[in-house]
């Protein structure tokens, strides 16, 4: 089994340490971080809002590399944020926010998005983790999408880290998933007949003007328009860097398993789009706190579905020598709950102040 390359992008909020509101200081933080000798110029990037920043690891071959880069980048950004009077926050949505959004980053594409959908952009203050896995060619990439799409609701549930919005509990474990689902091309990707079918359908979306560039394909998994990768985008950003490492290992193993199954002629399990969409909504609503709906439409315990996932990707994890690390982190997740669960426990202890204390503390790398 080939060892596929992997890279991770993480988006963070910047919070005012006094008010805990999103703080529009991205330009200053990025400038300060760029002065650090251990941060590359392309590794720290702007995001839609001036209260957000994004980091991108180099292309890696091991989870140790991914973890080292994420810790390094969180450390650099954390120092830069503190030097500019704010704090780094690895949460999918801001627990507290003002009615008016932070300023938009000065970028022509972002301005075009605001003109296209003003209210959606105003509420797009969300942060995710994106995992890129290298694939040999786009045709194989489409075959991968057809197979991993069935597992995206499980990843949504596992990564849930956005229960609060504008000072209240949304009732969802991943409110970020709901926010992203309002865009015209979003949620789990459809099944494609082949690469030509994929290209035809994307071109139709561009031609009719529903999207104005491939970057607006907000499917939860897609072919990257910039890199020779499959990009999984359904994950909320993680409180802890090692949980992002866990997801990098899981996603790479899903891609490797999909490639091997496609080459072996293993049939793609069927799943009606409405069932997959419903399973995705259910995962965003409940996280791992109860049941999940699998791609056969069965309501099962979250633990059983995670066990099925680990069995499915087990050989790929073994081949990459990732089994022990990923299994240990999955067991911790089941024991402690999702970041959304942990945020809610903090709320019971000390209100929203305790929630943001948890987020700031866990996001920091000391």
From Swiss-Prot:
GO MF annotation list: ATP binding; glutamate-cysteine ligase activity
**What protein family does this chain belong to?**
Belongs to the glutamate--cysteine ligase type 2 family. YbdK subfamily.
Please give the Pfam families that the UniProt record associates with this protein: GCS2 (PF04107)
Kindly list the biological process annotations in GO that this record carries. modified amino acid biosynthetic process
Tell me the domain of life. Answer: Bacteria
The UniProt catalytic activity note for this protein reads: L-cysteine + L-glutamate + ATP = gamma-L-glutamyl-L-cysteine + ADP + phosphate + H(+)
User: Mind listing the UniProt keywords for this protein, alphabetically?
Assistant: ATP-binding, Ligase, Nucleotide-binding
Protein EC: 6.3.2.2
Function according to Swiss-Prot or TrEMBL: ATP-dependent carboxylate-amine ligase which exhibits weak glutamate--cysteine ligase activity.
Q: What is this protein called?
A: Putative glutamate--cysteine ligase 2-2
Q: What residue stretch is flagged as signal peptide?
A: none
Per the database entry, which stretches of residues form a coiled coil? none
Keyword Manganese: yes or no?
Answer: no
